[in-house]
C-alpha cells in the first residue's frame, strides 16, 4: 500500500518532458508543471517551429510572463528524492538500472520486473503489466514445480554419472582381466614352445653324446688296428733285411697271421638316416592345450578316504597319500595292492582332477565303481574295466601302461603253419582281439586308422610278469597296453565324463597331451577316484587349480 501511495505521489511531481522528478518546477496557465530547464527548451523549440508557445501536454497557449514557480511541488519532489536516496529504502526495494525507480511492475510479455517509467516507455507500450505482488505467488508456484523437476533431473543425472563411473570401473576391471588372461595365455604358449625347444635340444645332446661316444670307440679300434699292422709290417721288413735263418724262422705262422688279418671298417653314421628335426605342429599343440583348458573347467574338489586295513598314510588335509611299510609284521609280504578311494562319488556330469606323481617309480590311478571295487586290490588281475577299474599306472620307473580287460580266447592261442595273422583275424570278434592280433610277436608291425580319426601304433602287450617281480601267467591277467611318452608325466589329469562314458588321462607336464582314453565304460554305480601309491614311499598328491 505504501508503495502505491509513493508511486502516485511520484507521478504528480514528475516532469512530463524528462520523466524525472521536477527540478525548479514552473506552472503554466493550464495548471501543468514542468522543470524550468525543460519548459524553457520547449518554449524556444515551439517558437521556432510554430511561432507560438503552447503546453506540451494540452497544447493550450501561454505567455512566458505567466510562468510561475511552484514551491509546493518543488518541496514534494525534494522529499521524494530524499526517500529514494535513503539506504533503508534502497535495501528494501530494487531499483531500475535505467531510471533509478523502484521495480514495482511485472511485464508479462518480457517476463521482467520494470519501473513505472519503463511501463510508459515505447519498449513496453501496450504490454500487460501487473504489480509484483499480484504475480509473485503464481510464479513462485511455477518455480517450485520447476525446482522439483530440476531436483529429479539432478538425481537422474547423478545416477547416470554414477552408472558411467561404475561402467568405467567395470570396463577397466574387465580389460585388466583380459590383459592378465592374454599375458597368461601367451606365457603358457611360450612355455609350451620353450618345453618343446628344451626337449629337442635334449634329444640332440643325447644323439651327440651317443654318436661321439660310438665314434670315439671306433677311433680307438682303428688306432689299435693300425698299430697292429705296423707291428706286422716291421716284422716283415726285419725278416726281409735279415739273414736266411731270420727269414725262415716261423715263416708259415707269419704268413698265416697275415692272411687272417681283416681290415675292420669303422662304424659310421649316414646323415640321411639321422632323425630330421621338424618344427613343432603349433596348431596341433594349441588344439591339445585347448582341450586341456576345456576339461579343466570341470575341476572337482576331491579328497582321500582312508581304507582299512591299509598300508597307506593320508595327510591331515586328505589330499596326499603315501605307502607305509607294515612295521609290526615286516617279514610278511603284502598280499594286496594298497590304495584309497576319493570322495565324492560321481553319478552324472563331467569331473576333472589332477594328481602330482613327481619322482615316483610306481603308481596306479584312475576311477573305480564303488560296489564292485575295494581300495585294497587282492591282485593285479583285478585291475580291469570288467571288474570296475579304469586305471593307468607306472612300474619299474619307466614302464607306463593302461589296464584293459584280458582278451578271452587268446591266452593259449598258438599259430600254425605261419598263418597266425589270418587265423587271428577270424578269431577277432571284438576290437580288443583284433588289436591284439596285430603285434610284433605275431609278425605284424603296422599302424592303423579306426573310427575316422583314431590313429594307433600296434605294440606287443605287456605281460603281468613284466609288471611285478615273480612269475604269474594267469589267464585272467589284464591286458596292459604300453603307453609311450616323450615326456614323463609329473602331473596327471583325470577327466571323467559320465554321460559319454569315458575316462581320459592327460599329461599335464607335456602341455596336456592325451595319455590314454577309456571309451564305452559301463558305470552302473557311483564312480569314485582311485589312487594307489604302490610300494613306493614317495607320495601322490591331489593338486589344486591354482597350484
From Swiss-Prot:
**Residues that coordinate or bind Zn(2+):** 96, 99, 118, 124
One GO MF term attached to the UniProt entry: zinc ion binding
Q: Zinc finger regions (B box-type), where?
A: 91-132
Keyword terms, alphabetized = Acetylation, Antiviral defense, Autophagy, Coiled coil, Cytoplasm, Immunity, Innate immunity, Metal-binding, Nucleus, Phosphoprotein, Transferase, Ubl conjugation, Ubl conjugation pathway, Zinc, Zinc-finger
Q: Where are the zinc fingers (RING-type)?
A: 15-59
Gene3D superfamilies membership: 2.60.120.920, Classic Zinc Finger, Zinc/RING finger domain, C3HC4 (zinc finger)
Which reaction is recorded as catalysed by this protein? S-ubiquitinyl-[E2 ubiquitin-conjugating enzyme]-L-cysteine + [acceptor protein]-L-lysine = [E2 ubiquitin-conjugating enzyme]-L-cysteine + N(6)-ubiquitinyl-[acceptor protein]-L-lysine
Q: Name one Pfam family in it.
A: zf-RING_UBOX
Q: Which residues carry this modification: N-acetylalanine?
A: 2
Coiled coil (UniProt feature): 132-225
Identify the stretch annotated as signal peptide in this record: none
PTM per UniProt?
Degraded in a proteasome-independent fashion in the absence of viral infection but in a proteasome-dependent fashion following exposure to restriction sensitive virus.
Annotated GO biological processes are: activation of innate immune response; autophagy; defense response to virus; innate immune response; positive regulation of canonical NF-kappaB signal transduction; positive regulation of MAPK cascade; positive regulation of NF-kappaB transcription factor activity; protein K63-linked ubiquitination
Compartment list? Cytoplasm; Nucleus
Its pathway is:
Protein modification; protein ubiquitination
The EC number(s) attached to this protein equal 2.3.2.27
Which residues does the record list as Phosphoserine (modified residue)?
86
Q: Where is this region: Required for interaction with GABARAP and for autophagy?
A: 186-199
* InterPro entries hit by this protein: B30.2/SPRY, B30.2/SPRY_sf, Butyrophylin_SPRY, ConA-like_dom_sf, SPRY_dom, TRIM/RBCC, Znf-RING_euk, Znf_B-box
What does the entry list under GO cellular component? nucleus; P-body
Lineage: superkingdom: Eukaryota
Q: In this protein, which residues make up the domain named B30.2/SPRY? A: 280-547
Spell out the family assignment given in the record's similarity comment.
Belongs to the TRIM/RBCC family.
Functional note: Capsid-specific restriction factor that prevents infection from non-host-adapted retroviruses. Blocks viral replication early in the life cycle, after viral entry but before reverse transcription. In addition to acting as a capsid-specific restriction factor, also acts as a pattern recognition receptor that activates innate immune signaling in response to the retroviral capsid lattice.
Assembly and interactions?
A: Can form homodimers and homotrimers. In addition to lower-order dimerization, also exhibits a higher-order multimerization and both low- and high-order multimerizations are essential for its restriction activity. Interacts with BTBD1 and BTBD2. Interacts with PSMC4, PSMC5, PSMD7 and HSPA8/HSC70. Interacts (via B30.2/SPRY domain) with HSPA1A/B. Interacts with PSMC2, MAP3K7/TAK1, TAB2 and TAB3. Interacts with SQSTM1. Interacts with TRIM6 and TRIM34. Interacts with ULK1 (phosphorylated form), GABARAP, GABARAPL1, GABARAPL2, MAP1LC3A, MAP1LC3C and BECN1.
Q: What is this protein called?
A: Tripartite motif-containing protein 5
Designated gene of the protein:
TRIM5
